[in-house]
């Protein structure tokens, strides 16, 4: 019995339908992920009617949820999602116009991070809506799809107009030193992961004909990022979000990559996942909300993807094996409580499903080529 078979036996018992082939595992989790896509093309963060509010569409989550379909060359699904995202921006173009003319003072004046997947309306309650990285990641992906993967997303002058306004929006914000709530939607700081997402987005979208990005806009981001790294922010030394600068954005040099990976593995890797940062209160199991941080499942897939891209096969396979142990019959949870087998209700988490599919695909594809 292979190691993969043993892992699935321990999870599912002795049932005949245990998926022991990696292609079957991918099919199973792709099916779970597809259930989260709505008619509009947008993905929910988690299952419908979940009490946590994760039955909404986040810009950032849709960026990561689409990655699985990209690696499997399902461009129809990818295009449908990004066409829907463009429609969101068009619906709220008046707000973008206002923000371009004068820098927003309050979080509600920023482009919001989450939307009703059917009406594309904003949710107005306070949710740390100041998330510059969510704009950076969308610019990055549209630029990558258009200029590198040759997948047409921008279809007419209205599309080009709204994308140009997103560039101008980041310029007005002065994203390189604009405090935001970041990937985790929490306290406002200047986050390296947010500055890096915007920088990567601007560098990629400038390759699309018809979109203008001033060189100074990129230079400002590069200088700011250089000053912050290897930290995530003034208050956070190491953070799971920093992995995004290695993959998918790939905007760091080798020394920076190695230092971030070393810090993440030493300080944040746990048994069932990767904690976001030390002192994370979200789903913290301890009454003091300090010392027992929740363990996020997609951290293992993220590390596997990075090590596969860096050519470190053994490390990539090791993190894939860790992620396989996190699977449940419902799919992959958002997180496990510290030092336990209990996971939270955001199961499946679309982001985790997509990262797992991508990691399993790339690691096994490489292994098969080498045989």
Model-derived regions: residue spans:
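Acidic, mature catalytic/reactive cores of soluble proteins
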Residues: 1-371
């Amino acid at each position: 019995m292979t190691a993969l078979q043993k892992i699935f036996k321990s999870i599912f018992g002795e049932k005949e339908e245990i998926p022991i082939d990696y292609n079957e595992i991918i099919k199973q989790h792709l099916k779970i992920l597809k259930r989260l896509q709505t008619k509009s093309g947008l993905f929910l963060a988690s299952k419908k009617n979940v009490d946590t509010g994760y039955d909404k569409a986040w810009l950032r989550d849709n960026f990561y949820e689409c990655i699985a379909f990209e690696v499997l060359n399902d461009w129809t699904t990818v295009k449908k999602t990004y066409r829907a995202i463009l429609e969101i921006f068009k619906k709220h173009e008046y707000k973008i116009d206002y923000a371009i003319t004068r820098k927003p003072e309050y979080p509600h004046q920023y482009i919001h991070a989450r939307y009703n997947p059917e009406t594309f309306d904003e949710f107005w309650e306070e949710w740390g809506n100041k998330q510059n990285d969510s704009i950076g990641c969308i610019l990055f992906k549209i630029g990558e799809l258009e200029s590198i993967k040759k997948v047409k997303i921008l279809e007419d002058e209205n599309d080009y107009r709204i994308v140009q306004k997103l560039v101008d929006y980041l310029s007005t914000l002065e994203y390189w030193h604009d405090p935001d709530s970041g990937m985790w939607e929490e306290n406002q700081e200047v986050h390296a992961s947010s500055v890096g997402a915007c920088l990567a987005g601007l560098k990629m979208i400038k390759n699309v004909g018809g979109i203008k990005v001033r060189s100074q806009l990129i230079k400002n981001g590069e200088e700011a990022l250089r000053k912050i790294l290897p930290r995530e922010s003034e208050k956070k030394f190491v953070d799971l979000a920093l992995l995004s600068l290695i993959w998918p954005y790939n905007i760091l040099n080798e020394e920076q990559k190695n230092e971030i990976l070393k810090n993440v593995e030493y300080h944040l890797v746990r048994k069932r996942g990767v904690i976001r940062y030390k002192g994370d209160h979200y789903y913290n199991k301890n009454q003091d909300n300090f010392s027992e941080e929740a363990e996020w499942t997609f951290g293992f897939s993220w590390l596997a993807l990075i090590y596969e891209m860096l050519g470190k096969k053994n490390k990539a396979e090791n993190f894939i094996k860790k992620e396989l142990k996190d699977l449940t019959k419902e799919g992959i949870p958002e997180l496990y409580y510290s030092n336990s087998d209990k996971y939270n209700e955001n199961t499946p988490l679309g982001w985790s499903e997509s990262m797992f599919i991508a990691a399993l695909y790339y690691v096994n594809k490489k292994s098969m080529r080498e045989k």
